[in-house]
Amino acid sequence: MGQDQTKQQIEKGLQLYQSNQTEKALQVWTKVLEKSSDLMGRFRVLGCLVTAHSEMGRYKEMLKFAVVQIDTARELEDADFLLESYLNLARSNEKLCEFHKTISYCKTCLGLPGTRAGAQLGGQVSLSMGNAFLGLSVFQKALESFEKALRYAHNNDDAMLECRVCCSLGSFYAQVKDYEKALFFPCKAAELVNNYGKGWSLKYRAMSQYHMAVAYRLLGRLGSAMECCEESMKIALQHGDRPLQALCLLCFADIHRSRGDLETAFPRYDSAMSIMTEIGNRLGQVQALLGVAKCWVARKALDKALDAIERAQDLAEEVGNKLSQLKLHCLSESIYRSKGLQRELRAHVVRFHECVEETELYCGLCGESIGEKNSRLQALPCSHIFHLRCLQNNGTRSCPNCRRSSMKPGFV
């Protein structure tokens, strides 16, 4: 298959894909890969296969095609293509919750010589890196990466990238419990979709609605949460977007749990868990198990809650997500306290405080924890976060966290 025919077939696949005939599109692209001798065409079709498998939640397949794409980029001896293929490799690992690998591949991207693609893709590299740091609960570096990605988006008038970064920032602030910002950023993403997104994939609308649903639930606005989640789920079902379907099911389950309707919550947690296990979203499985554990606690079935916590803890440690570990130790602590088991209680108290230290989830000005309850937060230019009230009361010209770490004794 020559260059022109390859190009034709790739376009045919794209048209099928955009009209939701995904399996037919995959067949066309796979045939191109088998028959085409045109390296440029092969590189492009591998990019299409990476994106399609990502949206379907077939992350192991996505990773496989990303690896082949790197080999093709090396054959082409082009730094632009190499950057693009390393970014796809980083994203594949991000989806599989291999966050340390993601960060490593993103650093490889940033270390490549300055290229035309570097200007276009630098923001996406920073976004993927931020998502990976967030997956590891390294909050300062996550925020630093997101802000860098946002600067790329603004400097290049890239509204699509800005939309994705706003969704990630929504997730960031939901985790550190500044619910006002957790809602502000996905609302900003939805506004970008309305203003610029006529020709965009509907997944951007679905993504912003999902993150709005999460924030509304945390704020106790359960009707609005349900409305946004239903809209997101509708698009996810239309497009066969399995990863988003799983997230919506998890959000529905959390909404029903918040309403005290445990009968309805349990099967939704099970469905979310089933899809997340199938696609390999281990962090999503941790969140589903945490929700299940909270349901069992509400029913006073403490041993069943501890079973769910144990499974979640294993996964959270495997993935390296410190915030989930912290939440699980906190829940275990309250269970063992009510059971009157002092030895187990003490062990979880110790681990809980270790996790707080590791995540640096405390305000460097007042010393109180961050992320325990909803409070307004503010980041300094170094991306360390503090209670807004503390910054207003104390006023700070330099970051106390940075000051402290620079004073730590080093090895000479």
Swiss-Prot record:
Gene Ontology cellular-component terms listed: centrosome; cytosol; Golgi apparatus; neuromuscular junction; plasma membrane; postsynaptic specialization membrane
Principal localisation: membrane
Protein family membership: Belongs to the RAPsyn family.
Domain comment (free text): A cysteine-rich region homologous to part of the regulatory domain of protein kinase C may be important in interactions of this protein with the lipid bilayer.
Annotated source species: Homo sapiens
Sites bearing Phosphoserine, chain numbering: S405
TPR repeats: 6-39, 83-116, 123-156, 163-196, 206-239, 246-279, 286-319
Phenotype upon changing R164C: In CMS11; reduced coclustering with acetylcholine receptor
Classification via SMART domains: RING, TPR
Keywords of the record: Cell membrane, Congenital myasthenic syndrome, Cytoplasm, Cytoskeleton, Disease variant, Lipoprotein, Membrane, Metal-binding, Myristate, Phosphoprotein, Postsynaptic cell membrane, Repeat, Synapse, TPR repeat, Ubl conjugation, Zinc, Zinc-finger
Keyword Cytoplasm in record: yes
ZnF start-end (RING-type): 363-403
Post-translational modification: Ubiquitinated by the BCR(KLHL8) complex, leading to its degradation.
Lipidation, N-myristoyl glycine type: G2
Protein name, as recorded: 43 kDa receptor-associated protein of the synapse
Bilayer disposition of the protein: Peripheral membrane protein
Record localization: Cell membrane; Postsynaptic cell membrane; Cytoplasm, Cytoskeleton
Annotated effect of mutating L283P: In CMS11; reduced coclustering with acetylcholine receptor
Function noted in UniProt: Postsynaptic protein required for clustering of nicotinic acetylcholine receptors (nAChRs) at the neuromuscular junction. It may link the receptor to the underlying postsynaptic cytoskeleton, possibly by direct association with actin or spectrin.
Sequence positions bearing Phosphotyrosine: Y196
UniProt record, GO biological process: chemical synaptic transmission; establishment of protein localization to postsynaptic membrane; motor neuron apoptotic process; neurotransmitter receptor localization to postsynaptic specialization membrane; positive regulation of motor neuron apoptotic process; positive regulation of neuromuscular synaptic transmission; regulation of postsynaptic membrane organization; skeletal muscle acetylcholine-gated channel clustering
Family matches, as Pfam families: Rapsyn_N, TPR_8, zf-RING_2
Recorded disease: Myasthenic syndrome, congenital, 11, associated with acetylcholine receptor deficiency: A form of congenital myasthenic syndrome, a group of disorders characterized by failure of neuromuscular transmission, including pre-synaptic, synaptic, and post-synaptic disorders that are not of autoimmune origin. Clinical features are easy fatigability and muscle weakness affecting the axial and limb muscles (with hypotonia in early-onset forms), the ocular muscles (leading to ptosis and ophthalmoplegia), and the facial and bulbar musculature (affecting sucking and swallowing, and leading to dysphonia).
Record annotation: effect of changing V45M: In CMS11; reduced coclustering with acetylcholine receptor
GO function terms (MF aspect): acetylcholine receptor binding; ionotropic glutamate receptor binding; protein-membrane adaptor activity; structural constituent of postsynaptic specialization; zinc ion binding
CDD domains, sorted: RING-H2_Rapsyn (cd16478)
